[in-house]
From Swiss-Prot:
Organism of derivation: Salmonella paratyphi B (strain ATCC BAA-1250 / SPB7)
Similarity comment: family membership: Belongs to the EPSP synthase family.
UniProt record, GO biological process: amino acid biosynthetic process; aromatic amino acid family biosynthetic process; chorismate biosynthetic process
Keyword check for Hydrolase: no
Cellular compartments annotated: Cytoplasm
This protein's UniProt keywords: Amino-acid biosynthesis, Aromatic amino acid biosynthesis, Cytoplasm, Transferase
UniProt lineage: Bacteria, Pseudomonadati, Pseudomonadota, Gammaproteobacteria, Enterobacterales
Active site per the UniProt annotation: 313
Its job: Catalyzes the transfer of the enolpyruvyl moiety of phosphoenolpyruvate (PEP) to the 5-hydroxyl of shikimate-3-phosphate (S3P) to produce enolpyruvyl shikimate-3-phosphate and inorganic phosphate.
EC number: 2.5.1.19
Highest taxon above the source species: Bacteria
Protein name, UniProt field: 3-phosphoshikimate 1-carboxyvinyltransferase
C-alpha cells in the first residue's frame, strides 16, 4: 500500500483559496440538470464524488462542458425530471452526495434504473430514504441486502404525505426536498427523531431558492412543498469553498501558527461547518472573520466538552486537534460518524490510540486525553479522505506521522498534502 510520511512541521502560515464545497457542488449539479435553462457553475470541486455525479448525469442524457481544470461547468438543464434512455445502471462509487439525491430524483421517471457503488457504499444505510420514497408511491427494490444499496428504481413517486427519519443522515431529507417540487402532487414531509446535521438542510434550502423554488419550513419538523413546480437556472453560480476542508488549515493555524487564512468562505457562508472556527476559538485560538475569509492565529489550546451534532464532518478535525490541547476533550452526539465513509468513531479511536492518546469510544461520543509525547505511527485511513487529512495534523509536533493510502483525499481534496506542504516550515 502506498504511504506518505510527514516530517515534523515547525510552523504553518499563509493563505489558501479553498476548493469548492462537495455538498454544494453535487447539489448544484443536480439542480442545474433538473432546471430550465443553462447554468454556469464556477469553483466547482474536482473530486471523485463530483465525477461520479457528472458521469451519472451524462448517462442520463444531460449535456455539459467542463473547463480544462474541471472547476467550471456549463450545464444545460432538462427542464424537469431526468429521463434514462432505457434500462440503465449507474455506478456511484462511495459518493453519498450522489447516491441519496439521485435515488430520490430518479423515482420521478418511469425507466428502470439500478444504482450501485463500491463495497463500502453497500454498507451505508439508505432504508429510511427508501421507506419515505415508497410512501410517496415510488417503486424500489433492494438487489442485495435489505435497507442498503444497490437499488432498482422504477419510478412512481407522486408526492403526498411522507415521514422521514432524520436521526441517521440529513441527506435523506435533502433528497426528498430536492425531488418533491417536481412531483405531480403537493408533498408534506414530517421529520421523525432528532434531525442530525441541520445546517446541511440549510444548504439544500438555500440552493433550491437560488434555482427558484421556495418551500415552507416549520421548525425543521415539517416541510410543505408545492407540486408541479420547475427549477429555473440562476445563470451563473459560484460554488463557495469547502468549509469542511477549511477545518484542517484553520486547526493547523491554531496549533502551529502564524496565522492561516482560508478564502472562499466567510461569515456569510451557507455551510454549517464554518462554525468549526468558533470551536477553535473556544479552545483558545484567535479567529478573524471577513465576508469571504476566515483567519486563525495560534493560541494556547485547552480541552473542550461539546455537542458536535451541528458540524459532524469538521468535528473530526477537533479529535486530532485535541492531541495539542491541555486536558481531556469530549465530543458528543456524533453517532452519525458511524454511517459515513467508514465507521469514523471506531476508526478515529483506533488511530488516536496508535499515536499514544488515551481514548474512550462511546456509542455516540469520543473522549480524548493527549499523551505527554506523541508516538510515530502508521495511520490507517479506511479509504476515508477525512481520516487522512485529520491525522496529517500529528506532524505539527516533534514526531513524524505516516499516512497510509494518502490518495484517498481525492474524494474531496486531491492536492491536500501539496497545499499543506506549501504553507509549512519544516522543524
Amino acid at each position: 500500500m502506498e504511504s506518505l510520511t510527514l516530517q515534523p512541521i515547525a510552523r504553518v502560515d499563509g493563505a489558501i483559496n479553498l476548493p469548492g464545497s462537495k455538498s454544494v457542488s453535487n447539489r448544484a449539479l443536480l439542480l442545474a440538470a433538473l432546471a430550465c435553462g443553462k447554468t454556469v457553475l464556477t469553483n466547482l470541486l474536482d473530486s471523485d464524488d463530483v465525477r461520479h455525479m457528472l458521469n451519472a448525469l451524462s448517462a442520463l442524457g444531460i449535456n455539459y462542458t467542463l473547463s480544462a481544470d474541471r472547476t467550471r461547468c456549463d450545464i444545460t438543464g432538462n427542464g424537469g425530471a431526468l429521463r434514462a434512455p432505457g434500462a440503465l445502471e449507474l455506478f456511484l462509487g462511495n459518493a453519498g452526495t450522489a447516491m441519496r439525491p439521485l435515488a430520490a430524483a430518479l423515482c420521478l421517471g418511469q425507466n428502470e434504473i439500478v444504482l450501485t457503488g463500491e463495497p463500502r457504499m453497500k454498507e451505508r444505510p439508505i432504508g429510511h430514504l427508501v421507506d419515505s420514497l415508497r410512501q410517496g408511491g415510488a417503486n424500489i427494490d433492494y438487489l442485495e441486502q435489505e435497507n442498503y444499496p444497490p437499488l432498482r428504481l422504477r419510478g412512481g413517486f407522486t408526492g403526498g404525505d411522507i415521514e422521514v427519519d432524520g436521526s441517521v443522515s440529513s441527506q435523506f431529507l435533502t433528497a426528498l426536498l430536492m425531488t418533491a417540487p417536481l412531483a405531480p402532487k403537493d408533498t408534506i414531509i414530517r421529520v421523525k427523531g432528532e434531525l442530525v446535521s441541520k445546517p446541511y438542510i440549510d444548504i439544500t434550502l438555500n440552493l433550491m431558492k437560488t434555482f427558484g423554488v421556495e418551500i415552507a419550513n416549520h421548525h425543521y419538523q415539517q416541510f410543505v412543498v408545492k407540486g408541479g413546480q420547475q427549477y429555473h437556472s440562476p445563470g451563473r453560480y459560484l460554488v463557495e469553498g469547502d468549509a469542511s476542508s477549511a477545518s484542517y488549515f484553520l486547526a493547523a493555524g491554531a496549533i502551529k501558527g502564524g496565522t492561516v487564512k482560508v478564502t472562499g468562505i466567510g461569515r456569510k457562508s451557507m455551510q454549517g461547518d464554518i462554525r468549526f472556527a468558533d470551536v477553535l476559538e473556544k479552545m483558545g485560538a484567535t479567529i478573524t472573520w471577513g465576508d469571504d475569509f476566515i483567519a486563525c492565529t495560534r493560541g494556547e489550546l485547552h480541552a473542550i466538552d461539546m455537542d458536535m451534532n451541528h458540524i459532524p464532518d469538521a468535528a473530526m478535525t477537533i479529535a486530532t486537534t485535541a492531541l495539542f490541547a491541555k486536558g481531556t476533550t469530549t465530543l458528543r452526539n456524533i453517532y452519525n460518524w458511524r454511517v459515513k465513509e467508514t465507521d469514523r468513531l471506531f476508526a478515529m479511536a483506533t488511530e488516536l490510540r496508535k499515536v499514544g492518546a488515551e481514548v474512550e469510544e462511546g456509542h455516540d461520543y469520543i473522549r480524548i486525553t493527549p499523551p505527554a509525547k506523541l508516538q510515530h505511527a502508521d495511520i490507517g485511513t479506511y479509504n476515508d479522505h477525512r481520516m487522512a487529512m485529520c491525522f496529517s495534523l500529528v506532524a505539527l509536533s516533534d514526531t513524524p506521522v505516516t499516512i497510509l493510502d494518502p490518495k484517498c483525499t481525492a474524494k474531496t481534496f486531491p492536492d491536500y498534502f501539496e497545499q499543506l506542504a506549501r504553507m509549512s516550515t519544516p522543524a
